[in-house]
């Protein structure tokens, strides 16, 4: 159902472990074109966790800055800060974890720092090489990537939209296959989770 072009309700079906049924029955509260709150009347959970997590039952669950950028999402329990380019500079989670981003003057992401508990992971992006805590981990290619720890190639097979559907090893063996809901969530994934880039939609 739509109101002036904005979706005000949405129902999704999905895999509930052994059955298939309603995983989301969402109603949206808007303030103009900005989302103010989401309520989910569905009680079932999806087997892959892609159902909406209704983490707050408040009149206002989403807050924005003067630029219209989201600064609080109470359903996900996050707060977002932005830099002068209006790019996210830090995301704070309700459990105390943080993700901090560093960009070049052109807005290209150079570094991500994850802090979870007492563990800090620093990821640096240097052209097509990804470093983790100072060690080169991946070399990105047009066809996929090379894992630098074992010097093995991994190839992406994409669909007509450019979504990564299958990842194969250098011998052509399947490592991962992904099947998507129309909204982008993975409803089935076979094999190992060998790459993070999935739905492009």
PLM region spans:
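Conserved catalytic cores of ATP-dependent inositol ring kinases
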Residues: 1-53, 106-108, 113-115, 121-122, ...
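Short, acidic, Ser/Thr-enriched surface-loop or helix-capping motifs
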Residues: 2, 29-30, 65, 83, ...
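Short loop/turn microsegments at loop-to-beta-strand junctions
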Residues: 25, 58-60, 76-78, 98, ...
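Extracellular repeat-rich scaffold modules on cell surfaces
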Residues: 49-81
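Beta-turn initiation residues at beta-strand->coil junctions
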Residues: 9-15, 37-42, 66, 71-76, ...
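A residue-level detector for well-ordered beta-strand positions
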Residues: 26-28, 61-62, 80, 101, ...
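A motif-centric feature for acidic-aromatic and gly/ser/thr-rich catalytic loops and repeats
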Residues: 20, 28, 150-201
């Amino acid at each position: 159902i739509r109101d002036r072009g904005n979706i005000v309700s949405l129902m999704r079906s999905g895999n509930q472990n052994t059955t298939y049924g309603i995983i989301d029955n969402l109603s949206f509260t808007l303030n103009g074109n900005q989302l103010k709150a989401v309520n989910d009347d569905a009680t079932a959970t999806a087997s892959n966790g892609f159902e909406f997590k209704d983490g707050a039952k408040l009149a206002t669950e989403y807050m924005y800055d003067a630029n219209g950028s989201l600064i609080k999402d109470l359903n996900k329990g996050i707060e977002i800060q932005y830099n002068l380019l209006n790019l996210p500079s830090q995301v704070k989670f309700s459990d105390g974890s943080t993700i901090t981003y560093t960009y070049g003057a052109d807005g290209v992401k150079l570094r991500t720092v994850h802090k979870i508990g007492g563990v800090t992971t620093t990821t640096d992006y240097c052209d097509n090489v990804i470093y983790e805590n100072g060690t080169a981990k991946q070399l990105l290619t047009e066809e996929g990537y090379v894992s630098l720890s074992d010097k093995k190639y991994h190839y992406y097979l994409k669909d007509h939209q450019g979504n990564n559907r299958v990842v194969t090893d250098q011998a052509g063996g399947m490592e991962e296959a992904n099947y998507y809901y129309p909204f982008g969530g993975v409803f089935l994934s076979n094999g190992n989770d060998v790459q993070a880039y999935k739905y492009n939609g």
